[in-house]
């Protein structure tokens, strides 16, 4: 449990630092390389009931506080609320895997939830952003290149980085859960059954 909580703390620091680097223009290639979906998936699968959903959402909220203050963005708007909803869907999938969370289930689930998260958030952007035509071509634009003002980081790049980061951070989380002492692993197994 302690390694998992340590990882969540590291996630906030990682997301805040990469967000600040991206904002400064020093690391645009890191756009959307964030471990939040992996944390939502893994927390729901591995952690005790009181942490399953609250920890990922609190992690997102704290990192949003830092980044939105930097970007001078609103803390709550429809796009952000959609992101929270999509993260909750990812958590529900992790919750469904809680009794069979292994390498064989969690790594493919990380890829599937990346697709789901990307689909939900980009479809929402397409539906709500007046910059997209409300037809199939507009949806394809939202899913591939995005809006012209964001040409430096097209949508497909966000998706690629999301896939890579979700897979990598899920692997790290599962590894940390596996290397715990037998006693800690037994505590997690008992907590998962609750």
Explain the meaning of each model-derived region.
Residues 1-54:
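Hydrophobic transmembrane alpha-helices
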Residues 1, 184-194:
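Short, charged juxtamembrane terminal tails flanking transmembrane helices
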Residues 5, 30-42, 80-89, 164-168:
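Membrane-embedded alpha-helical segments of multi-pass membrane proteins
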Residues 4-6, 53-54, 81-85, 107-111, ...:
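Hydrophobic alpha-helical transmembrane segments
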Residues 102-182, 186-187:
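Membrane-embedded alpha-helical hairpins and interfacial helices in multi-pass inner-membrane proteins
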Residues 7, 53-63, 106-115, 173, ...:
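Central hydrophobic cores of alpha-helical transmembrane segments
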Residues 16-32, 59-93:
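Interfacial aromatic-anchored transmembrane helix boundaries in multi-pass membrane proteins
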Residues 16-17, 42-50, 89, 93-101, ...:
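Structural signal for the C-terminal ends of transmembrane alpha-helices
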């Amino acid at each position: 449990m302690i390694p998992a909580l340590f990882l969540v703390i590291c996630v906030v620091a990682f997301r805040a630092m990469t967000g600040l680097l991206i904002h400064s223009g020093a690391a645009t290639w890191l756009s959307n390389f964030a471990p939040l979906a992996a944390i939502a998936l893994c927390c729901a699968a591995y952690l005790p009931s009181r942490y399953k959903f609250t920890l990922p959402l609190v992690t997102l909220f704290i990192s949003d506080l830092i980044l939105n203050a930097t970007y001078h963005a609103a803390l709550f708007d429809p796009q952000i609320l959609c992101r929270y909803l999509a993260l909750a869907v990812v958590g529900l999938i992790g919750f469904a895997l809680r009794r069979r969370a292994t390498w064989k289930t969690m790594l493919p689930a990380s890829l599937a939830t990346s697709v789901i998260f990307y689909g939900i958030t980009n479809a929402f952007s397409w539906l709500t952003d007046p910059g997209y035509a409300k037809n199939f071509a507009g949806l394809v634009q939202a899913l591939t290149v995005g809006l012209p003002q964001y040409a430096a980081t097209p949508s497909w790049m966000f998706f690629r980085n999301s896939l890579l980061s979700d897979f990598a951070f899920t692997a790290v989380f599962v590894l940390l859960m596996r290397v715990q002492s037998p006693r800690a692993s037994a505590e997690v197994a008992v907590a998962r059954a609750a």
